[in-house]
Amino acid sequence: VYNKNNDLIYTWNSANYYVADVAVSNDGNAIALALLGASGGTFVSEVYILRFDSATPKYKFTFDTLISSLMSAGENYMLATGIDSAYTVAWDGSSSSNLNVSGVIRSFMTYESGWSALTCGRENNDQINSVKIIGQNGMPISDFEFFSQIDGVGINAAEVIILSDQTVCVYDHSGNLKSELTSDVKPLHAVITQSGDIITVDNSRMQLLSAAE
């Protein structure tokens, strides 16, 4: 662990777990580790939350599934995701919550003010999917279906975008479709800014499609 001046603060290690991912809280006061192990032939994951003043974990959460990715979502919580499971974990160590996803996770994204979007669907059918919107308190606020392939997702404080081939679908947080925009080529990524502008990125360029109305 290093500070902003690139000075080593401390080193943490484990002989029993593989470190799958790390995350830093938005306020810069804590870090989280996703640790992966096995017990009886099944995956066991732990999420540790540490402060910068000590290498001793302050909080620990245990999950009987694979957790391979952590992403901070505002000041209150982080997303902890695996192949077919997802949780929110409070940065203050007070709780974790199972998001009860159905199927494999397609994509997810967080927004700095605390909103998150997560998409999942059937492993053998990429045309049947669902989208979960998680609020600033780390609890789901809506869940709606999306009947087309999902190549990416983005979110801001008011809207969520879903990238599907060359189309960017814009929804509000309740799952109401607001608009559909088309890119000249299939983008690799799409983001929605705080003001509602939608930017797509492919191998050679960035494109501003439109401002969300």
Kindly give the residue locations of the regions a language model identified.
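Long, acidic/polar, low-complexity amphipathic helices and coiled-coil-like
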Residues: V1-I67
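Short loop/turn segments that connect beta-strands within beta-propeller blades
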Residues: N3-D7, R51-S54, A90-S94, I134-N137, ...
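A short beta-strand motif characteristic of beta-propeller blades
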Residues: D7-N13, A55-F61, S94-N100, N137-F144, ...
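Short beta-strand elements that form the blades of beta-propeller/WD-repeat-like
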Residues: G28-G41, M71-G82, E112-N125, G152-S164, ...
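Structural motif
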Residues: S39-I49, D84-A90, N125-K132, T167-Y171, ...
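Eukaryotic tandem repeat interaction scaffolds
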Residues: G74-G152
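C-terminal closing repeat unit and adjoining cap/tail of repeat-based domains
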Residues: G135, S164-D197, V201-R205
